Protein backbone atom coordinates (compact mmCIF):
# COMPACT_ATOMS: atom_id res chain seq x y z
CA UNK A 1 0.00 0.00 0.00
CA UNK A 2 2.94 2.33 0.64
CA UNK A 3 4.10 2.31 -2.99
CA UNK A 4 0.54 2.86 -4.23
CA UNK A 5 0.20 5.78 -1.81
CA UNK A 6 3.49 7.35 -2.91
CA UNK A 7 2.54 7.15 -6.58
CA UNK A 8 -1.00 8.40 -5.93
CA UNK A 9 0.39 11.37 -4.00
CA UNK A 10 2.66 12.24 -6.91
CA UNK A 11 -0.23 11.82 -9.37
CA UNK A 12 -2.45 14.19 -7.35
CA UNK A 13 0.29 16.82 -7.26
CA UNK A 14 0.93 16.53 -10.99
CA UNK A 15 -2.82 16.78 -11.61
CA UNK A 16 -2.89 20.07 -9.70
CA UNK A 17 -0.16 21.49 -11.96
CA UNK A 18 -1.83 20.13 -15.10
CA UNK A 19 -5.24 21.50 -14.16
CA UNK A 20 -3.66 24.84 -13.27
CA UNK A 21 -2.04 24.99 -16.72
CA UNK A 22 -5.40 24.43 -18.42
CA UNK A 23 -7.03 27.13 -16.29
CA UNK A 24 -4.18 29.56 -16.93
CA UNK A 25 -4.53 29.00 -20.67
CA UNK A 26 -8.25 29.72 -20.39
CA UNK A 27 -7.64 32.91 -18.37
CA UNK A 28 -4.66 34.14 -20.42
CA UNK A 29 -2.21 33.77 -17.53
CA UNK A 30 1.39 32.57 -17.91
CA UNK A 31 1.35 29.34 -15.89
CA UNK A 32 5.14 29.28 -15.51
CA UNK A 33 5.20 32.77 -14.03
CA UNK A 34 2.28 31.95 -11.74
CA UNK A 35 3.94 28.77 -10.47
CA UNK A 36 7.21 30.61 -9.94
CA UNK A 37 5.45 33.26 -7.87
CA UNK A 38 3.40 30.76 -5.87
CA UNK A 39 6.47 28.64 -5.17
CA UNK A 40 8.09 31.58 -3.37
CA UNK A 41 5.91 30.69 -0.41
CA UNK A 42 7.97 28.39 1.85
CA UNK A 43 5.25 25.74 2.13
CA UNK A 44 4.28 25.67 -1.56
CA UNK A 45 5.96 23.48 -4.17
CA UNK A 46 3.80 23.31 -7.29
CA UNK A 47 5.23 20.89 -9.83
CA UNK A 48 5.70 21.64 -13.52
CA UNK A 49 2.73 20.82 -15.75
CA UNK A 50 3.17 18.50 -18.70
CA UNK A 51 1.21 16.63 -21.34
CA UNK A 52 -0.06 14.01 -18.90
CA UNK A 53 1.40 11.28 -16.71
CA UNK A 54 3.00 8.12 -17.99
CA UNK A 55 5.14 5.22 -16.98
CA UNK A 56 4.22 1.91 -15.47
CA UNK A 57 3.81 3.23 -11.91
CA UNK A 58 2.29 6.70 -11.48
CA UNK A 59 -0.15 6.31 -14.39
CA UNK A 60 -1.27 2.86 -13.18
CA UNK A 61 -0.92 2.47 -9.40
CA UNK A 62 -3.59 5.00 -8.32
CA UNK A 63 -6.25 2.93 -10.09
CA UNK A 64 -5.67 0.09 -7.60
CA UNK A 65 -6.66 2.42 -4.74
CA UNK A 66 -9.59 3.84 -6.74
CA UNK A 67 -11.00 0.40 -7.55
CA UNK A 68 -10.57 -0.86 -3.99
CA UNK A 69 -11.69 2.37 -2.31
CA UNK A 70 -14.70 3.28 -4.42
CA UNK A 71 -16.37 6.58 -3.55
CA UNK A 72 -13.88 7.37 -0.79
CA UNK A 73 -11.06 7.55 -3.36
CA UNK A 74 -12.65 10.40 -5.31
CA UNK A 75 -9.67 12.79 -5.11
CA UNK A 76 -7.29 10.12 -6.39
CA UNK A 77 -9.76 9.21 -9.15
CA UNK A 78 -10.18 12.86 -10.06
CA UNK A 79 -6.42 13.31 -10.32
CA UNK A 80 -6.17 10.33 -12.67
CA UNK A 81 -8.95 11.80 -14.82
CA UNK A 82 -7.25 15.22 -14.95
CA UNK A 83 -3.93 13.70 -15.95
CA UNK A 84 -5.51 11.41 -18.55
CA UNK A 85 -7.45 14.37 -19.97
CA UNK A 86 -4.35 16.54 -20.30
CA UNK A 87 -3.14 14.57 -23.34
CA UNK A 88 -6.51 15.08 -25.07
CA UNK A 89 -6.35 18.79 -24.25
CA UNK A 90 -2.86 18.96 -25.78
CA UNK A 91 -4.03 17.17 -28.92
CA UNK A 92 -6.81 19.71 -29.41
CA UNK A 93 -4.42 22.64 -28.86
CA UNK A 94 -1.99 21.23 -31.44
CA UNK A 95 -4.73 20.47 -33.97
CA UNK A 96 -6.15 23.99 -33.55
CA UNK A 97 -2.69 25.50 -34.13
CA UNK A 98 -2.27 23.31 -37.21
CA UNK A 99 -5.66 24.39 -38.57
CA UNK A 100 -4.84 28.05 -37.96
CA UNK A 101 -1.54 27.60 -39.81
CA UNK A 102 -3.29 25.88 -42.72
CA UNK A 103 -5.90 28.65 -43.01
CA UNK A 104 -3.20 31.34 -42.96
CA UNK A 105 -0.74 29.59 -45.31
CA UNK A 106 -2.91 27.50 -47.62
CA UNK A 107 -1.11 24.27 -46.74
CA UNK A 108 -0.92 21.79 -43.89
CA UNK A 109 1.94 22.39 -41.48
CA UNK A 110 4.65 19.95 -40.57
CA UNK A 111 4.50 19.49 -36.78
CA UNK A 112 7.57 18.43 -34.80
CA UNK A 113 6.70 16.44 -31.67
CA UNK A 114 9.74 16.76 -29.43
CA UNK A 115 10.09 13.98 -26.88
CA UNK A 116 8.19 10.70 -26.80
CA UNK A 117 9.29 9.11 -23.51
CA UNK A 118 7.06 9.27 -20.45
CA UNK A 119 9.51 11.58 -18.65
CA UNK A 120 12.74 13.45 -19.41
CA UNK A 121 16.10 11.78 -19.98
CA UNK A 122 14.94 8.18 -20.39
CA UNK A 123 14.20 5.84 -23.30
CA UNK A 124 11.08 4.29 -21.74
CA UNK A 125 7.89 4.81 -23.76
CA UNK A 126 5.55 2.79 -21.50
CA UNK A 127 2.22 4.54 -20.93
CA UNK A 128 3.73 7.70 -22.45
CA UNK A 129 1.21 10.49 -23.06
CA UNK A 130 3.70 12.11 -25.46
CA UNK A 131 3.82 8.94 -27.55
CA UNK A 132 0.03 8.68 -27.48
CA UNK A 133 -0.31 12.33 -28.55
CA UNK A 134 2.10 11.76 -31.44
CA UNK A 135 0.28 8.60 -32.57
CA UNK A 136 -3.09 10.30 -32.37
CA UNK A 137 -1.93 13.31 -34.38
CA UNK A 138 -0.63 10.98 -37.09
CA UNK A 139 -3.91 9.02 -37.07
CA UNK A 140 -5.84 12.29 -37.36
CA UNK A 141 -3.89 13.27 -40.48
CA UNK A 142 -1.37 15.71 -39.03
CA UNK A 143 2.04 15.66 -40.78
CA UNK A 144 4.24 14.81 -37.79
CA UNK A 145 8.00 14.69 -37.38
CA UNK A 146 8.72 12.62 -34.26
CA UNK A 147 11.83 13.35 -32.19
CA UNK A 148 13.11 11.25 -29.29
CA UNK A 149 16.85 11.55 -28.68
CA UNK A 150 16.95 8.53 -26.38
CA UNK A 151 15.82 5.96 -28.95
CA UNK A 152 17.11 5.19 -32.44
CA UNK A 153 13.97 3.78 -34.06
CA UNK A 154 10.27 3.17 -33.52
CA UNK A 155 8.09 0.51 -35.13
CA UNK A 156 5.25 2.90 -36.04
CA UNK A 157 7.07 5.94 -37.45
CA UNK A 158 10.46 7.39 -38.27
CA UNK A 159 12.47 9.10 -35.53
CA UNK A 160 14.08 12.33 -36.73
CA UNK A 161 17.08 14.26 -35.47
CA UNK A 162 15.97 17.32 -33.50
CA UNK A 163 18.03 19.74 -35.62
CA UNK A 164 16.46 18.43 -38.81
CA UNK A 165 13.00 18.52 -37.24
CA UNK A 166 13.41 22.17 -36.26
CA UNK A 167 14.67 23.00 -39.74
CA UNK A 168 11.75 21.39 -41.62
CA UNK A 169 8.84 21.97 -39.23
CA UNK A 170 6.32 24.79 -39.14
CA UNK A 171 5.08 24.06 -35.62
CA UNK A 172 7.28 22.74 -32.83
CA UNK A 173 5.61 21.03 -29.87
CA UNK A 174 7.70 20.26 -26.79
CA UNK A 175 6.05 17.25 -25.19
CA UNK A 176 8.98 16.05 -23.06
CA UNK A 177 11.99 18.20 -22.21
CA UNK A 178 15.16 16.16 -22.52
Language-model features and meaning:
Residues 1-178:
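Structural/interface elements that position substrates and couple domains in central-metabolism enzymes
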